Every structure is written in structure tokens, then in C-alpha cells.
């Protein structure tokens, strides 16, 4: 089944070109099934790029999904036109009364700040708390994952001596997990962060289970059964060129940065990188969407009540 997004959203044309099945409002109405309601709280500066990355993966699943784009009020992004936000985004207040089958909270390039220093931290805390009653399953990504596991469990983040940056091998620690169905034992994941959460802190929380980990860059994916939450600290959703764009951006700005680990062929930044994580990114999002479909109440109003 396709994903339903506004026909005029910039991501629409890109995704059609890539072969992702999309659906218009009229086509959605003709299908006599309830589409899964997925919200995306987009905290990234370049919102359009993130919309494409997330919609590409969600839209590849065999279920009808309706995607709602959400933004915080406490911050105005510099890299996304105001007209785009007004046309395609809802504020949290505008969706607060709604229920969602799934909700994604993205990262943001503010990880070196203390959480309490973030201008929209109190609003984000409200959103985290709201997901416990209004969302069936929440996927918190990168900084969003670190912020969420700190908010709910007090798990701290630690600064790294140098940026974890590149494509790193990760291990499948729980092959029987529904979220890792079809995963290899060892696979590649893009990483781009200045901070980390540590296994020792996560192991102290009985409700948390580590699903993916790298020997080089640590914990990647954590599942919380009680709250039906996932904490993904890396970037399976990244495009083939995302890391190179970050690298050349820093080079052009004069920011000291090493070549991304195991990314450019022969460590030559003049050569186009090869995507070695795409299949597992699709697997992960497909597994997440499928688990939501299998377990969410048919009636949206029952989400958060414990009823099916």
C-alpha cells in the first residue's frame, strides 16, 4: 500500500521519481481500510530532506499510511522556508488532541547543548509525555532518542573526544526481536554524532533492552517494552550522500573534520560513496510499521487505554 502525503509537498515529486508508491486524497478515500496514522515531529534544520528520507522508508511498506508533519513552536528553522512550514506542518497544539498509531521524533544538531539549554526543551518534554497516552508506538531518532531516554529514564549523554562519523559495523543482539526480523548478524549503519549513551547506564534500567550495538561506536538501538518506545541513536534513514554533504559542509566552513569512517571508496572523497545500509533501513522501518499494524487498536480512540 502507498503512503498518503499532500500532492504539493516537495517530497512528492522526488518520491514518485524513485518509484515510491504515493496516494492522493481521493484515492485514499476509495480504499475501505483505516490507514495507519503516523506523525513526524521534524526537528532537523533541513526539513524537506528529512521528510523525503522518512517518507521513502514509510512509503515502502505494504500498508496504507497517512503521514502528519509536526513542528515545535519554540524554534524557527533557518533552512526551511516559512511558507513550507505553514503549508505542510501542524504545530503540536494543533495535533495534541489526536491519537497516532506511530510517531517519529527526529534528531537535531544541538547535541553538545545540555538538554535544559535547548530553547524548546519544555515543549519537547510535553510531547514526550503526550506520546505515552496518545501514541501506540514511538520511534525516537539520534538526538531525539538520547533526549527521550534521558527524559523517561535519566540516562545521560556523554561528549565524545572526536565525532563518531561514518559507516560502522553493528551487531544484531536480539535476532528474535520483531524489529530485527530478517536482519543479518552484522550490518552497516551510518553514524553522525558528537555524543553517546553508554551500555552501563542502559543496563541499569530494567525496562530497556539493547537490540543493536557496535564495538566501535556503542549502543545503536534500544527497545522499551513497557512504553512501546524505540530509541535509535544512529541514522539508518540517511541518503547515500548525507555523510558526504555533512563532510564537505564542514570542510567548506573550515571546521576540523576527519573523513567519514569506511564511507568513501578507498577513502577518496572524490569518489561517490556506496550505500551499504539501504536494505536494513527498509527492513527496520517495515518491521516497525508491521508491528504497529499487528498491535494497534482498530479504533484510534482506544490508543493509550490498553484496549484493543
Swiss-Prot record:
GO molecular function, one term: homoserine O-succinyltransferase activity
Site (Important for acyl-CoA specificity): 111
Keywords: Acyltransferase, Amino-acid biosynthesis, Cytoplasm, Methionine biosynthesis, Transferase
Protein's UniProt name: Homoserine O-acetyltransferase
GO cellular component: cytoplasm
Record's keyword annotation contains Kinase: no
The protein's Enzyme Commission number: 2.3.1.31
Catalysed reaction, written as an equation: L-homoserine + acetyl-CoA = O-acetyl-L-homoserine + CoA
EC class of the enzyme, as a word: transferase
PANTHER family in the cross-refs: HOMOSERINE O-SUCCINYLTRANSFERASE
Amino acid at each position: 500500500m502507498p503512503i498518503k502525503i499532500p500532492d504539493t509537498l516537495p517530497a512528492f515529486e522526488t518520491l514518485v521519481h524513485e518509484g515510491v508508491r504515493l496516494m492522493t486524497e481521493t484515492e485514499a478515500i476509495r480504499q475501505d481500510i483505516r490507514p495507519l496514522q503516523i506523525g513526524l515531529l521534524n526537528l532537523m534544520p533541513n526539513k524537506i530532506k528529512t521528510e523525503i528520507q522518512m517518507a521513502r522508508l514509510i512509503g515502502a511498506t505494504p500498508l496504507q499510511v497517512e503521514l502528519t508533519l509536526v513542528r515545535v513552536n519554540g524554534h524557527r528553522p533557518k533552512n526551511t522556508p516559512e511558507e513550507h512550514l505553514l503549508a505542510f506542518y501542524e504545530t503540536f497544539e494543533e495535533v495534541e488532541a489526536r491519537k497516532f498509531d506511530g510517531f517519529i521524533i527526529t534528531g537535531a544538531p544541538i547535541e553538545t547543548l545540555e538538554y535544559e539549554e535547548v530553547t524548546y526543551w519544555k515543549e519537547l518534554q510535553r510531547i514526550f509525555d503526550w506520546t505515552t497516552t496518545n501514541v501506540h508506538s514511538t520511534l525516537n531518532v539520534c538526538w531525539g532518542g538520547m533526549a527521550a531516554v534521558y527524559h523517561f529514564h535519566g540516562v545521560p549523554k556523554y561528549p565524545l573526544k572526536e565525532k563518531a562519523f561514518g559507516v560502522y559495523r553493528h551487531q544484531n543482539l536480539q535476532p528474535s526481536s520483531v524489529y530485527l526480523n530478517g536482519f543479518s548478524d552484522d550490518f552497516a549503519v551510518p553514524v553522525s554524532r558528537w555524543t553517546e549513551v553508554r551500555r552501563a547506564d542502559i543496563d541499569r534500567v530494567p525496562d530497556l533492552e539493547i537490540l543493536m550495538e557496535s564495538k566501535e561506536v556503542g549502543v545503536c538501538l534500544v527497545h522499551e517494552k513497557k512504553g512501546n518506545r524505540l530509541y535509535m541513536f544512529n541514522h539508518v534513514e540517511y541518503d547515500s550522500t548525507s555523510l558526504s554533504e555533512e563532510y564537505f559542509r564542514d570542510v567548506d566552513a573550515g571546521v576540523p573534520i576527519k573523513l567519514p569512517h569506511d564511507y568513501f571508496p578507498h577513502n577518496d572523497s572524490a569518489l561517490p560513496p556506496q550505500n551499504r545500509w539501504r536494505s536494513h533501513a527498509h527492513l527496520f522501518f517495515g518491521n516497525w510499521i508491521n508491528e504497529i499494524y499487528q498491535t494497534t487498536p482498530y479504533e484510534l480512540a482506544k490508543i493509550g487505554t490498553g484496549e484493543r
